[in-house]
Design a protein with these regions (language model features):
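FIC/Doc superfamily catalytic core
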Residues: 1-144
Length: 144
């Protein structure tokens, strides 16, 4: 249905909507994780390719990487790729480029401040992820 309705919008308007969504989505997604760039500063970085004074380089990379990751997800959807471990690792690598080593399972324990949940250690996480994808495939094939 989305693609049907999308076809009724002229290409310039559609492109404008998509560009606005990409910018707003990137800003909001990185802001919720603590990024201090404003929406206007995010626009300057992403659309004008300019850095913003007084901001950490990490924050610049976060918004640039988020935009790349969003486009990667759109590409995977357009190519009708199934969500799998490879795609998730690719996304992690894109999101963390120039920040930390990404696309691999962590080897050290982590904590979530203020949360009662303790994330699994590296090896346990690997097993849980494998089980998740097996369960996902099973649910897709079963009638629920």
């Amino acid at each position: 249905m989305y693609n049907q309705k999308k076809g009724s919008i002229d290409s310039i308007t559609l492109s404008s909507y998509e560009q606005d969504f990409e910018l707003t989505y990137t800003h909001n997604s990185t802001a919720i994780e603590g990024n201090t760039l404003t929406l206007i500063e995010t626009k300057v970085v992403l659309e004008d390719g300019k850095s913003v004074g007084g901001k950490k380089q990490r924050e610049i990379y976060e918004v640039v990487n988020h935009k790349k990751a969003y486009r990667y997800v759109k590409k995977c959807i357009a190519e009708e790729k199934k969500l799998d471990e490879h795609i998730v690792k690719d996304l992690h690598a894109i999101l963390t480029e120039n920040i930390i080593v990404g696309g691999v399972y962590r080897s050290e324990p982590v904590r979530i401040s203020g949360a009662g949940h303790t994330p699994p250690v590296g090896n346990d996480m690997y097993i849980q992820i494998k089980n998740f994808y097996e369960d996902l495939a099973w649910k897709k094939d079963s009638q629920i």
